[in-house]
Design a protein with these regions (language model features):
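Core segments of cupin and vicinal oxygen chelate
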Residues: 11-53
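A short, acidic/glycine-rich surface segment
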Residues: 32-34, 40-42, 56, 61-67, ...
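N-terminal beta-strand motif that seeds the catalytic metal site of vicinal oxygen chelate
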Residues: 1-18, 74-77
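Mid-chain, well-packed structural core segment of small domains
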Residues: 70-85
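Vicinal oxygen chelate
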Residues: 1-2, 46-48, 88-126
């Protein structure tokens, strides 16, 4: 095998305050480090959730990602949870809207989607 594991996933957000609040304060990611990159005029925030690292680049005025219709590239991030229903209730209590819960036709497991401040689809899956 060429690779041991995925080291990190990088996403781009457009609003520093909204993105950091969403991923850290609402979803519970831990900030590992945070840097302003003057040469690029953007921020890079390294986040951690369990064994997963997420690089959050904040690039003001970045073009919007096409979600509908879907474009090539990263489709979504998916988080494993013990209970989709309980997690949906918690997301709703935080003011985060979700799609209706459904059952994955191939795995038989419950799942649903919600969106980050820049409309990146995020999935929760049992």
């Amino acid at each position: 095998m060429l690779f041991d594991t995925i080291h990190h996933i990088a996403i781009i957000g457009s609003d520093y305050t909204a993105s950091k609040h969403f991923y850290v304060d609402l979803l519970g990611f831990e900030v590992i480090r945070e840097n302003y990159r003057a040469e690029r005029g953007d921020y890079k925030i390294d986040l951690k959730l369990g064994d997963c690292e997420l690089e959050l680049f904040i690039i003001p005025n970045s073009p919007s990602r096409l979600s509908f219709p879907e474009a090539c590239g990263l489709r979504h991030l998916a988080f494993r949870v013990k209970s989709v229903d309980e997690t949906v209730d918690k997301l709703h209590a935080l003011g985060i809207k979700t799609e209706p819960v459904r059952t994955d036709a191939f795995t038989g497991e419950k799942m649903t989607f919600f969106f980050d401040p820049d409309n990146l689809p995020l999935e929760i899956h049992e």
